[in-house]
Regions:
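ATP-binding N-terminal substructure of ATP-dependent carboxylate-amine bond-forming enzymes
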Residues: 1-127, 139-147, 397
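ATP-dependent carboxylate activation and anion-phosphoryl transfer catalytic cores
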Residues: 2-3, 8-25, 49, 72-74, ...
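Alpha-helix initiation/capping motif
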Residues: 60, 85, 113, 138, ...
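Conserved beta3 strand of the protein kinase N-lobe
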Residues: 134-135
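Active-site neighborhoods of enzyme catalytic cores
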Residues: 155
Length: 449
């Protein structure tokens, strides 16, 4: 391999995940960290470590100059951005490549295209992906907006062209609200992302969030690794993910998988990507593409046996895809619980010292986490501290194993979301697989959370 030393431009469990894949390939690792993460597990385990700034992300994990300097002084020949932070920053990818450092990610132009939600929708349509009815591009004129909304049919949703996470999104149920809500969505988008551009789509009543994992070699070859169901969400943030989806048939998987793989091949896409759809009444509607590794990638690894991070590194190194589409078999069922350092019912962050820690174990149980007893969870970053991934031959068997694994997980000191997951696993709707993206918030409201 040409890659001998890899800089990990991230923190937490994903930094550790990348380190593990690199070491299994005989590649040295460089950890970059803020002062708040000096004692983090990935920093302890890496072959080299460089402090790149104070705790605030803008001064450390988003500090492009500091990261490039760290790569140069440690002679790193590749950078893996993980997820979040700079992972979908096309300018950063260009700067990395301009410094003759291998970028472990898609081509910068594809990151840029898919990062602009309007351009992404246009591109997806041109590639043959099914779209939600709505505007072809940005909407600024109220009369035009009313005509689009009438054609799509109320209710409609107004969305920010840049960013996500629920900011700059407004649901409109009638023409009289439209102008006000467009202004509100634009203001929110401007404040959050520096871009007031918005567009309009048909608002689906009770959809599921289904996403397909794709991989391309950048040379016109691409595969899909099936779907994940990420419908259990709170405020547009995923809580639990499973693969395969309880509602997608093998025929649907093959049909949509073929469509997304062809789209990526036609695009010349390189590396890992996720194409997200809303699914309702048997129909798929493209919402966005993430040009990076996803938090929930382990459930796909569990049912396919493909190491996605290893594949990312191989492709960035110029090697072909290690598997062909016909080699991929979908076996069994996997569920991931995101364990956050927060109150399980109020969702208030709960940073601080971990006084004791014991990871669940046993057959087909995986825990991705950098926690250890005595570690202090910093208050500056995302609250996710661990991912519990469980595999079973059937969905029912997987759920039973997950219940057992959650009983075994011990994290004392901070409050965690473990009790939330335990409660979810007793709910008839979850057990039957009958839930939509609205289900979790409605369930929490009924509980008074």
């Amino acid at each position: 391999m040409a890659i001998r030393r890899l800089l990990i431009a991230n923190r937490g469990e994903i930094a550790l995940r990348i380190h593990r894949a690199a070491h299994e390939m005989g590649i040295e690792t460089v950890a970059v960290h803020s002062t708040a993460d000096a004692e983090a597990m990935h920093v302890r385990l890496a072959d080299h470590a460089v402090c790149i700034g104070p705790p605030a992300a803008r001064d450390s994990y988003l500090n492009v100059a500091a990261i490039i300097s760290a790569a140069e002084i440690t002679h790193a020949d590749a950078i893996h951005p993980g997820y979040g932070f700079l992972s979908e920053n096309a300018k950063f990818a260009e700067i990395v490549e301009a410094h003759d450092i291998t970028w472990i990610g898609p081509k910068p132009e594809h990151i840029r295209t898919m990062g602009d939600k309007i351009e992404a929708k246009r591109t997806a349509g041109a590639l043959g992906l099914p779209l939600v009815p709505g505007s072809d591009g940005a909407v600024s004129d109220v009369n035009e907006a009313k005509a689009i909304a009438e054609a799509a049919g109320y209710p409609v949703i107004i969305k920010a062209a840049s960013g996500g996470g629920g900011r700059g999104m407004k649901v409109c149920t009638s023409p009289d609200q439209l102008e006000t809500l467009i202004q509100q969505a634009g203001s929110e988008a401007k404040a959050a992302f520096g871009d007031a551009t918005v567009y309009i789509e048909k608002y689906l009543g009770n959809p599921r969030h289904i996403e397909f994992q794709v991989f391309g070699d950048g040379k016109g070859n691409a595969i899909h690794l099936g779907e994940r169901d990420c419908s259990l969400q709170r405020r547009h943030q995923k809580v639990l993910e499973e693969a395969p989806s309880p509602v997608i048939s093998p025929d649907e998987r093959e049909r949509m998988g073929g469509i997304v793989a062809k789209a990526m091949a036609d695009m010349g896409y390189r590396g890992a990507g996720t194409i997200e759809f809303l699914w309702e009444n048997g129909e798929f509607y493209f919402i966005e593409m993430n040009t990076r590794l996803q938090v929930e990638h382990p459930v796909t690894e569990a049912i396919t046996g493909v190491d996605l991070v290893r594949e990312q590194i191989r492709i960035a190194d110029g090697l072909p895809l290690s598997v062909k589409q016909e080699d991929i078999e979908f076996k069994g069922h996997a569920i991931e619980c995101r364990i956050n350092a927060e109150d399980p019912w109020t969702f208030a962050p709960s940073p601080g010292e971990v006084t004791s820690y014991h990871a669940a174990g046993g057959m087909h149980v995986r825990v991705d986490s950098g926690l250890y007893a005595g570690y202090r969870i910093p208050p500056y970053y995302d609250s996710m501290i661990a991912k519990l991934i469980v595999y079973g031959r059937t969905r029912e068997g997987c759920i039973m194993r997950l219940k057992r694994a959650l009983e075994e997980m011990v994290i004392t000191g901070p409050k965690t979301s473990i009790p939330l997951h335990q409660a979810l696993l007793t709910e008839p709707d979850f057990l039957s697989g009958d839930y939509s993206i609205k289900w979790l918030e409605e369930w929490l409201a009924r509980r008074g959370a």
